[in-house]
């Protein structure tokens, strides 16, 4: 499976050039493929906030490279560069508050600085750590894909109809995807009849990004409006809903793109299995439950403007980016460390105590 997945890898969204970071501008896809160049931590923070780059793993990787750029700038300026670097950490941390991979990556970079040996070049050490974070995410994608395919096959070995939400592919990670990586692997193994893709309003990550990735891979796919999910489950024989995650708490609650919670409720009602796929860096054991997660909200203009024209300008807007799916609605959480079925606090603790695969 590993070799087949690597051979099928086509899309990259993050490229490190040593002195700058290039990000495939996801606001312009699929009509334009434009690379956005960042030469400072502030530029990367803006790119994260403005959705040039999105997806929890990709955000974390980008932030790691941003600290390399920041360290070089701070050291060149002289003075207490470590203290000054904390300003860059804070700037990056504030760019997307829900994605725990962002904070995980920043902590990994901080810890690397704390382990510096006498005479060791801090910038070189940080660069090596950022590259390691990037490469580790790719390896995690491979492991999750295999675990996810094994889970699908164990429940039903014939080609199946799957439903996914938002974008969890190569555009959202350092490899070829979390949930979409499992779907890609399932397709290579002959387990996919068709993938139904939620459009995912208001940024349309499903219709702009996931559909683009699936079509590029030759995976049979159908785009649907978000509100068709219940009808699809009832009429199209959906066997799995497969989604990613931006944060998973110690009890197995999952914060993900808005609309995920309602998919889980609908899946439970229709007897459809619900799988969450995310690296262990997405799991925040410091939070007991999803009630403690800070859920980002974005500007109301995202709902009030169509083709540059503003409608119902005076109405109040509620535009949350994420919601929380309770653990008791989830059949399985798939990570690079293994699979937790019917997650709870004890099972999540056992998972996180396992040795890392990379």
Curated annotation (Swiss-Prot):
GO terms for biological process: L-methionine salvage from methylthioadenosine. InterPro entries: IF-2B-related, IF-M1Pi, IF_2B-like_C, Initiation_fac_2B_a/b/d, M1Pi_N, NagB/RpiA_transferase-like. The keyword Amino-acid biosynthesis applies. The record marks 166 as: Transition state stabilizer. It catalyses: 5-(methylsulfanyl)-alpha-D-ribose 1-phosphate = 5-(methylsulfanyl)-D-ribulose 1-phosphate. Its EC number is 5.3.1.23. The active site is at residue 246. GO terms for molecular function: S-methyl-5-thioribose-1-phosphate isomerase activity. Belongs to the eIF-2B alpha/beta/delta subunits family. MtnA subfamily. This is Methylthioribose-1-phosphate isomerase. It comes from Stutzerimonas stutzeri (strain A1501). The gene is mtnA.
């Amino acid at each position: 499976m590993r070799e087949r997945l690597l051979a099928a890898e086509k899309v990259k969204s993050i490229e490190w050039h040593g002195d700058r970071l290039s990000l495939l501008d996801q606001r312009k896809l699929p009509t334009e493929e434009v690379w956005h160049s960042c030469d400072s931590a502030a530029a990367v923070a803006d790119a994260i906030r403005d959705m040039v780059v999105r997806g929890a793993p990709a955000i974390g990787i980008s932030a790691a490279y941003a600290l390399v750029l920041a360290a070089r700038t701070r050291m060149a300026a002289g003075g207490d560069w470590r203290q000054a670097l904390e300003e860059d950490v804070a700037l990056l941390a504030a760019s997307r508050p829900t994605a725990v991979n962002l904070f995980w990556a920043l902590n990994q970079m901080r810890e690397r600085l704390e382990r510096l040996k006498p005479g060791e070049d801090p910038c070189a050490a940080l660069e090596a750590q950022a590259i390691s974070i990037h490469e580790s995410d790719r390896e995690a994608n491979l492991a999750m894909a295999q675990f996810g395919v094994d889970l699908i096959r164990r429940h039903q070995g014939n080609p199946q109809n799957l439903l996914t939400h938002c974008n969890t592919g190569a555009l959202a990670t350092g490899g070829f995807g979390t949930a979409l990586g499992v779907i890609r692997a399932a397709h290579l193994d002959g387990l996919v009849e068709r993938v139904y893709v939620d459009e995912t309003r208001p940024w349309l990550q499903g219709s702009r990004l996931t559909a683009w990735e699936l079509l590029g891979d030759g995976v049979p796919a159908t785009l649907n409006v978000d509100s068709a999910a219940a009808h699809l489950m009832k009429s199209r024989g959906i066997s799995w809903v497969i989604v990613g995650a931006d944060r998973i708490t110690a009890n197995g609650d999952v914060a993900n793109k808005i609309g995920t919670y309602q998919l889980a409720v609908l899946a439970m009602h229709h007897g459809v299995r619900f799988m969450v796929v995310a690296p262990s860096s997405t799991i925040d054991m410091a939070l007991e439950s999803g009630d403690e997660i800070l859920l980002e909200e974005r500007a109301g203009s995202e709902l009030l403007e169509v083709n540059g024209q503003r409608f119902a300008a005076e109405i109040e807007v509620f535009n949350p980016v994420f919601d929380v799916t309770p653990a008791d609605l989830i059949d399985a959480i798939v990570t690079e460390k293994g699979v937790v079925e019917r997650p709870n606090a004890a099972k999540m603790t056992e998972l996180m105590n396992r040795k890392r695969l990379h």
